From Swiss-Prot:
Origin species: Rattus norvegicus
InterPro entries linked: Ig-like_dom, Ig-like_dom_sf, Ig-like_fold, Ig_sub, Ig_sub2, Ig_V-set, JAM-C
Membrane-crossing segments per the record: 242-262
UniProt-recorded name of the protein: Junctional adhesion molecule C
Lineage: Eukaryota, Metazoa, Chordata, Craniata, Vertebrata
Gene name in the database record: Jam3
Ig-like C2-type domain residues: 139-236
Length: 310
């Protein structure tokens, strides 16, 4: 008797919890709810990816499912009226009734995708969730610019650029297949060099080159999707020939002096005068035949005298 009385008391004490549980379950079942196994999938270009959208609770046997793509402020349909739409047609299918599988993804597939479910038999008829898809792109061979020759003690800049990779790649430089540190002072092996590598911009800057900096240089662009390198290019560091430079300057000065003296001598000899008039070379106008010129008493007054020639 005492045992059955205690059991009845326990059951009575638990009755309110039981009814609350039924009420709670009724509320959940009457509202459609969604979940995803991965809200932020990351995939490499040309691979496949699943966009998970799972109905956890619903009383509607055949809810309406729609997928939309949100990119650059524009919203387009991906799955509507039980059909794949837009540029995903032909490489996307539906699995698990509400989830999407995209084959051969491209960089243009990077976007926010929204799964929308309408369950008309549920008290809460609509639920939605968003998934952000990131497509990583492997870098292509970067463009490298390496000076062919630099004099000792001068500054030099080597450049490396790549524009296809996503996320944005980082850069590393190699000399004769040996990786260069970001700062030459950080490695005793490069104590005779003075350079700095910017892994974000891809520049390798020498403040002053030394003979030891001669060699073959190449750059590698890397990100989470892969890496690519440019072809190696040689850079020669040479000594300045001071004696040769001084000799060349002297030769130029001597040549200029000789040319100047030649011009002066030619000018003195009259080579640059086109015509010359003096007393010896001047000729008076010839007399006209049949006309005599008679000077009168007044200076410079001339008059004509006619004559006949028989």
């Amino acid at each position: 008797m005492a045992l059955s009385r205690r059991l009845r008391l326990r059951l009575c004490a638990r009755l309110p919890d039981f009814f609350l549980l039924l009420l709670f379950r009724g509320c959940v079942i009457e509202a459609v709810n969604l979940k995803s196994s991965n809200r932020n999938p990351v995939v490499h270009e040309f691979e496949s990816v699943e966009l998970s959208c799972i109905i956890t609770d619903s009383q509607t046997n055949d809810p309406r499912i729609e997928w939309k793509k949100i990119q650059d402020g524009q919203t387009t349909y991906v799955y509507f009226d039980n059909k794949i739409q837009g540029d995903l047609a032909g490489r996307t299918d539906v699995f698990g009734k509400t989830s999407l599988r995209i084959w051969n993804v491209t960089r243009s597939d990077s976007a926010i995708y929204r799964c929308e479910v309408v369950a008309l038999n549920d008290r809460k008829e609509v639920d939605e969730l968003t998934i952000e898809l990131i497509v990583q792109v492997k870098p292509v061979a970067p463009v490298c610019r390496v000076p062919k020759a630099v004099p000792v003690g001068k500054a030099a800049t080597l450049q490396c650029q790549e524009s296809e990779g996503y996320p944005r790649p980082y850069y590393s430089w190699y000399r004769n297949d040996v990786p260069l540190p970001t700062d030459s002072r950080a490695n005793p092996r490069f104590q005779n060099s003075s350079f700095h590598v910017n892994s974000e911009t891809g520049t390798l800057v020498f403040s002053a080159v030394h003979k030891e900096d001669s060699g073959q240089y190449y750059c590698i662009a890397s990100n989470d999707a892969g890496a690519a390198r440019c072809e190696g290019q040689d850079m020669e560091v040479y000594d300045l020939n001071i004696a040769g430079i001084i000799g060349g300057v002297l030769v130029v000065l001597i040549v200029l002096a000789v040319i100047t003296m030649g011009i002066c001598c030619a000018y003195r000899r009259g080579c640059f005068i086109s015509s010359k008039q003096d007393g010896e070379s001047y000729k008076s106008p010839g007399k006209h035949e049949g006309v005599n010129y008679i000077r009168t008493s007044e200076e410079g007054d001339f008059r004509h005298k006619s004559s006949f020639v028989i």
